[in-house]
Each structure stands twice: as structure tokens, then as C-alpha cells.
Amino acid sequence: MEIDLEKFKRIHFIGIGGISMSGLAHILLEEGHTITGSDIKNSHLIERLEKEGAKINIPHMAESVIGADLVVYTAAIHDDNVEYQKAKELGIPIIDRATLLGLIMKKYKFGVAVAGSHGKTTTTSLISVILDRAGYDPTVLVGGEIDAIGGNVRVGKSEYFVTEACEYTDSFLKFYPYIAVILNVDSDHLDYFKNIDNIKQSFRQFASLVPSDGFVVACKDDANTMHVIKGLEKNIVTYGINEKSDWQAKDITYDEKGCASFNVYYRGKFIGHFKLSIPGKHNIYNALASLAVTYLLGVDTEKAKEYIKEFKGTHRRFEVKGVVEGVTVVDDYAHHPAEIHATLEAAKNYPHKRIIAIFQPHTYSRTKALLSDFAESFDAADKIIITDIYAAREKDTGIVSSKDLVDLIFKRGKDVLYIKDFDSIVEYLKENTEEGDLVLTIGAGNIYEVGEKFLEENKK
């Protein structure tokens, strides 16, 4: 069905507390819609929406949808949800999160959609900050929180829209990108996709959404990405380190905290010497992608260079949470083997005596599908603690457990422990950390609570 958002006065969100859902609700509030919603628990994102005028119920209640003109639901919501069922019974139009995002994006002339298995949040944030600082007044929806824009969403008054584009359930095929960014393509979300070929096919469809005057920005160093765009009749701009590309980083050095400095060349011409304030080689790629996108939109490269240097990262992306008794606590959202590997490589360049990695696997399907890759991804850690799998949208059917991962890591000769609950991990850290240790909480669930609690209790 063709949907005109202007016709819907009251829009109800089932699962309004999610990072993307809360951002979409914020945008619609700013546009003058009445927003209601529900979730299973309260959060600072929900409290912010309530302050802005949204009416939100905890938990889900069937009567919450009565009177709504449109209902939006998130991927975590199943058909048996009481509000979803009530909306169907009442004949209220129902759309998913990605459809709504696409409808909002469609209104903007210059939509930038950042896709890829890894690096979406940081790259989206970088592009957003550069455009914001350069005076473009963009509307932004990020899958993380950035201090520079005051959260996970920013509503501008221009024709520029920047968002992350997730491939899960082919969500990004509902978008309207003027610039489609493909950072990398990796095996993930195998509860939905059958295999890597299936994933590549989805990314190719995404790249094909770009209009004839638009652009696809792609990483030349990523073989899967190059396979995705091969023969695609679109305006393609590439970036990379190893391969000769339109945008290339050369002469890379790292400072004592693992942050890179490098020279940038555009089609062989020297552009400038760039410096990052966020650690890791992977962030060179994210910076190059951001530079390529903002250049296409007319941002001066000297200005972009300045804003890239000032960028301090986003919450939960190698976020230094604090230091207590000489122990540094860092938190990272990494939940795929490639991300964990990149995060630990960044940690290696950060001052430390030992790296203690605490990992909460995210979803049973991903843990099962990539089990041996997960085991290998911790090779750079000195000590590893694995806790129970964070189920997210799934149910535990017994196909895999954290102990299976612990066994594989142990077979690689690593110092690894399984500790079930967070309180016990905190107690273990209190008794076993030394001055100079780097404690790294890793995962897309709520594992960050361990680091926060350890810091809090040690300050007493």
C-alpha cells in the first residue's frame, strides 16, 4: 500500500525504546505528529521522548494502540505481541521500522545510507558530524549515541538525510539512497540469510537503489564488496589502503594510543595529512568512506580533515569508561568475529599490561554459525571471560551455549573462563586485575554494565 505519513496524526510505536525506533519517533514528533509507544522496560531514550511529549506505556498493553492511525513495529516484535494483534483486529495500518525509515528518507533530496557488516555507526556518525560542522544542517539517524549531535538523532531543516542501513531482513532495500555506502560485506545474520552469496545479492540490490545521478561509495580492499558492485551500472567511488582506489590512505603511522595518522590521495593527487582521534586501523577505512561521501556533497576537504581529527567517537565504540586503581575500562559494541578482532587490534596499540576481554555473545544463531571464527577472534587477548549468550530477539533452543565457545578458545591455548553472572565477573575483576590492565567489555547486549559496576564499586 502507498503510505502518505502526513495523513496519520497519531503514530504508535511497538518497541519504542530501541535505538532506531526512538530516533524515528523523535523525528516524527518534530514534524508535528502525536507519538505514543510501548516497550518492556524504561530507558533514558524513552525518558527523553516523554519529555518531548510522547506518551509511553511499560509494558506492552493491547489498549495502547486504540485510537492510533498508524502502528510501527520493530524486528524484535513477534506476531503474538498483544499490541500487534490488537492493531490487526482493529484494522489499523501496520508497518515495520525499515518501511517507516524509508518513507522519511524519501522526503529528502540527498539521502546517505551507510551499509556494511561492520563500521556503520562510526561512519554514519563521522559523515553526520562533518556535514553538521560544515553547515549542512542534516537530519541524522544513528545506531549509537554521539555527544557531538546530542544523542542518536538530529533533526535538521535541509535536504540532507544520513542514516545507517542494516541488511538484516533486507531492511535497507526499503530505503531511498542518493549515496549508498558499502563498507564491507561479511557473513552475519545467518538466521535470516542462507549464506554469503545470499548476503552479497542483498547488498547488490541495495546498491541498485541509487538513482542515475547518485553514487555508490565502496571499499576497494574488501573482496566481497568488489564482487557486489562488479558490472553495476552506477557512479562508483572507491576507497582503500592496499588497493589503488579513488581515495587512498598511505604512509600510515600510529600514536601511543593506537590512533592513526596518514596521507590521503584522491585519484593520485595528494589531498592532505589526516589524523584520527579514535584508535584502530578499521577507523582509517571509516574516515576514508566519510571523506568520499562528504566530498561528493561538496564539503571542502580541508574542513573535513579538521572535523575528522576532532571526532572523538560514539558511545559503545572503543569507549573509555574510566580508570580505577590503574585499571582502564573500555567498552565496545563488537559482536561479530571481524569486529572483535579489529577491537582487540586497537586495544593492542593502547597502553596496557594485559588485555582482559569480557565477551557476551549476541544471539544463538550468530554464535552457532560463527563459533570457530569467534574462538579465533580472541587471540590478541591475554585473558578472556565469556558470559551467557544475550538472546535479543531469539529463544534458547539448546543449539549452542557459551561453554561451547569457551571449549574452543581453551583448545587454542588461551586463558579463558566461563562466568555466568555479571556480579561474579565484577568480583573476579576486583580480585584479579593489576595496575596497567586494560579491561575490555565486548558485545551488543548489556555487558557494559560489568565495566560500569567494576568502576563504581572500586571507587568506594
Curated annotation (Swiss-Prot):
ATP binds at G116, S117, H118, G119, K120, T121, T122. InterPro entries: Mur-like_cat_sf, Mur_ligase_C, Mur_ligase_C_dom_sf, Mur_ligase_cen, Mur_ligase_N, MurCDEF_pg_biosynth, UDP-N-AcMur_Ala_ligase_MurC. One of its GO terms (biological process) is peptidoglycan biosynthetic process. It catalyses: UDP-N-acetyl-alpha-D-muramate + L-alanine + ATP = UDP-N-acetyl-alpha-D-muramoyl-L-alanine + ADP + phosphate + H(+). Keywords: ATP-binding, Cell cycle, Cell division, Cell shape, Cell wall biogenesis/degradation, Cytoplasm, Ligase, Nucleotide-binding, Peptidoglycan synthesis. GO terms for molecular function: ATP binding; UDP-N-acetylmuramate-L-alanine ligase activity. It is found in: Cytoplasm. Its EC number is 6.3.2.8. Pathway: Cell wall biogenesis; peptidoglycan biosynthesis. GO terms for cellular component: cytoplasm. SUPFAM superfamilies: MurCD N-terminal domain (SSF51984), MurD-like peptide ligases, catalytic domain (SSF53623), MurD-like peptide ligases, peptide-binding domain (SSF53244). It holds the Pfam family Mur_ligase_M. It comes from the Bacteria. NCBIfam families: murC (TIGR01082). Belongs to the MurCDEF family. Cell wall formation. This is UDP-N-acetylmuramate--L-alanine ligase. The lineage of its organism: Bacteria, Bacillati, Bacillota, Clostridia, Thermoanaerobacterales. The gene is murC.
